[in-house]
Amino acid sequence: MKRAFIITCIAIAVLFSHPILADQTQIPNYQTAKQKFWGDIYPYGSWTLYCGKKFTNRSETEDGMPLSIEHVYPRSWMRDHLECGNHDQCQDNSERYRLMESDLHNMYGALRNVNSSRGDAPYGIIPEENWRYDYCDYERAPNIAEPRPIARGNIARSIFYMHVEYGLPVDSDLASLLKQWNRDDPPSCHEMRRNNWIEELQGTRNPFIDHPKKIEDLQF
């Protein structure tokens, strides 16, 4: 069974291995993106990025914890790069910002309180175990957030996708850490299937899910 599972993953990677790099233009705004996120990618639920909490609807987990959508590459970083003003100003005046914040490759389900805790803090490693919540391997210190190991590869590939797709900056120290996370936590079958679903919805793939070793070629 395990061998068949691995072969299936390989088949998915080979079948959809052609690179597609062009700004997504099929989802014009975040409201549409949210509808597609909950209604088309996760109509039957999944697990939250940071805590692995199972959910079957768009409002809460199975044990009643409120949900939200996490932008792995924070929207505040996008605004800083575009210099388009605050969130409302950027939504009103920058089409590029609207497309960036609506890119499904950068969006994951998260517990609302954990999403709020992370804010726009960069990811990193906190020296000692410092769980913010007793039900979740998520750590927070001033100016740094440490996700659970099983989420780190997804996070790395999302950030590098946003960097290449939109020219968004990534700090060199963070890039080095994310490259290691990509090595340690390769794409799962679910991440590969999600890549396929998103391509159907917005016309772009994350090439680093298809070819994670290409991340090593990125220069910072």
Please provide the spans of the model-predicted regions.
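Positively charged n-region of N-terminal signal peptides that target proteins for export
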Residues: 1-4
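General helical structural elements
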Residues: 6-7, 197
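Intrinsically disordered, low-complexity segments enriched in polar/charged small residues
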Residues: 7-8, 80
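Cleavable N-terminal signal peptides
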Residues: 8-10, 20
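Aromatic-lined ligand-binding clefts that engage carbohydrates, nucleic acids, or primary amines
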Residues: 23-66, 177-180, 190-191
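Domain-level detector of nuclease and nuclease-like folds
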Residues: 61-68, 72-220
